[in-house]
Amino acid sequence: MRLTVQSFQRKFDPTDPNVKQKMNDYSETLIQQIDTMSAVASAFSNFASMPAQQNETLNVVEVVELAMDIFNEEYIEFHSDSPKIISKIDRTQLIRIITNLAKNAIQSIPEQQENKSIIVSVKKELNNVLITVADNGIGIQPKDIDRIFEPKFTTKSSGMGLGLGIIKNIIENYKGTITFETEFGKGTTFTVSLPIINS
């Protein structure tokens, strides 16, 4: 949202003949981002009671990109090989999944580390949409690898994350999968796969 406002400040020209249309486009973008932030706030409001899941037909690319707008870290990149990939999943739950994976990635990178990098990507592969969150943080210790998806398992003493066990359950409820690759000292990549709806 901050980037949207900054971009508008730089580009706004009151003498532009299309100023009304541009104001409308800008307003619609802000409304979308506010709705996304509201969904994120709702997703984080009560971890103990998971709301009933809804089946919504939505554009995964759009939802993931909007969810990433809440993060201010300049080293986070978003990529997609398509502007629209349709799946059936609860919007709030998808935002839960993405924001938690991104938050975990941010926390895995030491504050003092140079050349920080998190790449979030969405692509279509056969009958699935693949969402990957890759970081160049500290990675997962070998002793923790087999416990990552255990309920309530965490390597952090504090934080708002749902835990990967709950994230995994949400994904599996939508016939999806979550996997990861990690190298201790070099980083981790999580991949979420969900079935798509072919148009």
Role assignments for model-derived ranges:
Residues M1-D35:
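Histidine phosphotransfer helical core of two-component systems
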Residues M50-Q53, I86-I89, T155:
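Conserved micro-motifs of the catalytic ATP-binding
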Residues Q54-M68:
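A conserved beta-strand-to-alpha-helix junction within the catalytic ATP-binding
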Residues V60, G139-R147:
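Short helix N-cap motif at coil->helix boundaries in the Bergerat
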Residues N115-N127:
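Short beta-strand/loop element within the Bergerat-fold HATPase_c
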Residues G163, I167:
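Short alpha-helical Gxxx[C/S/T] motif in the catalytic ATP-binding
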Residues I171-E172:
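Detector for a conserved hydrophobic position within an alpha-helical segment of the HATPase_c
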